[in-house]
A protein has these predicted regions:
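Flexible interhelical linker loops that connect adjacent transmembrane helices
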Residues: 4, 263-294
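Membrane-water interface segments at the C-terminal ends of transmembrane alpha-helices
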Residues: 7-41, 50-163, 191-216, 245-262, ...
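Peri-membrane helix termini and adjoining interfacial loops of integral membrane proteins
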Residues: 34-45, 116-128, 218-227, 268-275, ...
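Short amphipathic alpha-helical coupling elements at transmembrane boundaries
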Residues: 45, 90-93, 126, 167-175, ...
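Glycine-rich helix-loop "coupling/hinge" segments at transmembrane-helix boundaries
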Residues: 113, 212-238, 476-504
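Short helix-to-coil transition segments within interhelical loops
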Residues: 163-192, 359, 437-458
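Juxtamembrane inter-helical linkers in multi-pass membrane proteins
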Residues: 171, 179-182, 268-282, 317-318, ...
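Short cytosolic juxtamembrane segments of multi-pass membrane proteins
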Residues: 270-281, 361-362, 528-536
């Protein structure tokens, strides 16, 4: 009896293997390009370079301080946000989530407008007869920017841990008379301490790989990170060998941080409770005052830079800047790259999760985890490292392309995959648990299942993942910093040129347009499924 030949690779495994192979091949190609261009001389001489060790020490030191200054206040801010209900609370929580995807140069421009030598606070001090001595450049400026980005994110993540505490535990603690320190120690701390290490590791990794912030606010050789040293080696000194060596060092450090972060990141099961959001009726005055002060301080950290971008952007140069063709060319380039990178990112992410889901359904858990980890691998190669590898690879083979669209789109798509994975991972598993048996009984599989089940049931998560990927791409500066020129500008690159040439009023208009574009793009894409979309 004739039987149909079985394929070497099952059809359901092809999407994930293809996407994983692409990601791993790109990472490997970039690594080999860096390795081949690394100096072949005595490595001992390199390790004895005092400036190199200063750069490495500063990279770790600023990342450690940034993580510390972000996580410790976030513990108390998260507790305040959990205990208090006030008008605008949901808007504040949404703003906390948005700071992660806010374009770095926009935030930097707002920080300079508030804390700079001629900023709002300097003007206020001058009117009061006081001297403003704070400088937003150097280590203190870098820390301020990193706290601006990461404190809200840490607060949001720790707030989720507090919301997982069963209401019965809180009620029992109140009945036993536990207050203040004892309540924090015995009820809240056991839940927080499981979330703090992975949050701190994530923030440390993000700050260690920070590029645009250090480039804009670094105070010269004393405040230089490894990524900035890579950029300087290629853009100013044109020393590919040194850039390759620094990129390899950065990649090794980031790989270690990624593995540490994955090791610390353990899912916290929500507590089983019948009392959702239970609040202690014995709410003391000093507790309300402390929480109010913390929330007001958080607002004073977040709102002034954003308001400064809006207020400073509406200036007398607005009509002239809007009439410049260069601005609209940069805007179109940013939009084109962001949409293409976002779609490519979501497609690759779905390919990984599709095959991973099938592997898990067949009890091949380890293989499924390996497939998903291939998408997280790109975190070990920050954008500037990946772009450096591409730069050296192309420069030594076919030459640099006339248009950098393809490289920037592809790199930005890869850099956004870890974020898209986090958005789509759990919804994809929920869909599997809900519809898998039904699809098997009806014989729905492959493309038909994707069209009938996944694309309908995942409309909201897909839109959210696409919005995150697009906004992350539109605000990226690390990759464009290497390939950007007068013929290829994105809005962040154009803003950096304006800041560098001291055209502050023109830059304020560009920063405002970039801020509005990001919020508009995120909102429009997130609302694409519609408010009353049916996912059943």
């Amino acid at each position: 009896m004739a039987t149909r030949r079985q394929p070497l690779i099952p059809g359901w495994l092809i999407p994930g293997v293809s996407a994983a192979t692409l990601v791993v091949a790109v990472a490997l190609a970039a690594f080999l390009a860096l390795w081949w261009n690394a100096p072949q001389g005595s490595w001992a001489a390199i390790w004895q370079d005092s400036y190199l060790w200063h750069v490495v020490r500063f990279s770790f030191w600023q990342a450690f301080l940034s993580a510390l200054l972000s996580v410790v206040p976030a513990i108390f801010l998260a507790r305040a946000l959990y205990r208090r209900r006030f008008p605008g609370r949901l808007a504040l929580l949404r703003l906390c989530a948005m700071t992660l995807i806010l374009p770095v140069l926009v935030a930097v421009f707002g920080i300079l407008s508030v804390y700079g030598r001629q900023g709002w606070l300097a003007t206020l001090c001058q009117s009061l007869g006081l001297e403003w001595t704070f400088s937003p450049y150097g280590l203190q400026g870098i820390l301020l920017a990193h706290v601006f980005f990461n404190l809200p994110m840490a607060s949001r993540l720790l707030l989720q841990a507090l919301e997982n505490i069963p209401g019965e535990q809180r009620q029992l603690a109140a009945q036993l008379g536990m207050r203040s320190w004892h309540f924090f120690r015995f009820v809240e701390w056991p839940w927080l301490r499981r979330q703090i290490p992975p949050v701190a590791a994530l923030i440390f990794m993000l700050c260690f790989a920070s590029f645009a912030t250090v480039l804009s606010l670094g105070g010269g050789p004393q405040a230089t990170t490894i990524e900035l040293a890579i950029y300087q080696a290629l853009s100013y000194d044109y020393d590919p060998a040194r850039a390759a060596m620094l990129a390899l060092l950065q990649m090794v450090c980031c790989l270690g941080l990624v593995l540490l972060s994955q090791r610390l990141s353990k899912a916290i099961a929500p507590g089983t409770t019948l009392l959702q959001g239970w609040r202690d009726p014995d709410d003391r005055l000093h507790s309300r005052i402390c929480d109010t002060v913390l929330i007001v301080l958080a607002l004073l950290l977040l709102l002034p830079p954003l308001l400064a971008v809006i207020v400073d952007g509406v200036n007398r140069q607005l009509p002239e800047v809007l009439a410049q063709p260069v601005l609209w060319q940069a805007l179109w380039t940013s939009l084109r790259i962001a949409l293409a990178a976002g779609v490519l990112c979501v497609v690759l992410t779905m390919m990984l999760l599709w095959s991973s889901r099938e592997l898990r359904a067949r009890q091949k858990m380890l293989a499924g985890q390996v497939l998903e980890m291939s998408g997280m691998l790109i975190l070990a190669m920050p954008g500037i490292v990946l772009a450096t590898g591409f730069f050296l690879l192309l420069n030594n083979t076919i030459g640099l392309p006339q248009s950098a669209d393809g490289i920037v789109i592809f790199t930005n798509a890869l850099m956004a995959i870890p974020y898209a994975l986090k958005v789509l991972e759990n919804p994809m598993r929920d869909i599997t648990a809900r519809y898998s048996m039904l699809c098997q009984s009806l014989g729905i599989e492959g493309w038909s299942r994707l069209k009938v089940v996944e694309l309908r049931a995942l409309k909201r998560p897909l839109a959210q993942a696409l919005a995150f990927a697009c906004v992350l791409s539109i605000g990226d500066f690390g990759v464009v910093a290497l390939f950007g020129n007068d013929d290829f500008r994105t809005l962040p690159f154009y803003l950096y040129q304006q800041i560098g040439s001291y055209r502050s009023q023109d830059g304020a208009v560009t920063a405002l347009i970039l801020l509005l574009l990001c919020f508009l793009l995120f909102t429009v894409i997130e609302k694409l499924p519609g408010r009353n979309v049916k996912t059943d």
